[in-house]
Regions:
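Exposed loop/turn and edge beta-strand positions of beta-sandwich/beta-sheet ligand-binding modules
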Residues: 7, 40, 50, 72, ...
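Mid-chain, well-packed structural core segment of small domains
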Residues: 69, 75-88
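Histidine-centered active-site/metal-ligand motif
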Residues: 10, 54-55, 75, 109
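Core segments of cupin and vicinal oxygen chelate
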Residues: 14-53
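Conserved beta-strand in the GNAT
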Residues: 55-57, 121
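Vicinal oxygen chelate
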Residues: 1-4, 87-132
Length: 132
């Protein structure tokens, strides 16, 4: 059997806060709301570059339960660039975040939460950046 699983394609959030969630990913993380197939339920696809990395299901008007956080998933990690600029941007936007350096490495992480309390980890390989 010649089979292998590749990289993460996307993650999905079910929310009653569709507009607020899309706005967070656009304004705070610099992603963009983009094309989405005409499913029979409302939602949005949020893109990083040309790839829809976040699918959002709008569960308003349904009896589906709004989960208070990521459930059994602890967090979602995304590769990022511009460590210092990101820290400054988050501070300017008033977004609570914490910074961590991965031991014995040049990798830094910034952790923050979206409007649905999903924890987002941004990973920066700072050896490729001018200053940290």
């Amino acid at each position: 059997m010649d089979m292998r699983v590749g990289q993460l394609d996307h993650y999905n959030i079910s929310t009653r806060k569709l507009k607020e969630t899309v706005q967070f990913y656009e304004d705070v993380l610099g992603m963009r709301n983009g094309p989405r197939p005409p499913f029979n339920f409302p939602g949005a696809w949020v893109y990083s570059g040309d790839h829809p990395v976040l699918h959002i299901n709008d569960i308003s008007g349904t009896d589906k339960e709004q989960r208070p956080d990521s459930g059994v998933i602890d967090h979602v990690a995304l590769g990022a660039r511009g460590f210092e600029a990101t820290k400054k941007h988050l501070t300017t936007k008033g977004v609570a975040h914490r910074v961590n350096q991965v031991p014995n490495s040049t990798r830094w992480q910034i952790f923050l939460r979206d409007p649905n309390n999903v924890e987002i980890e941004l990973n920066f390989e700072t050896k490729n950046e001018v200053a940290v």
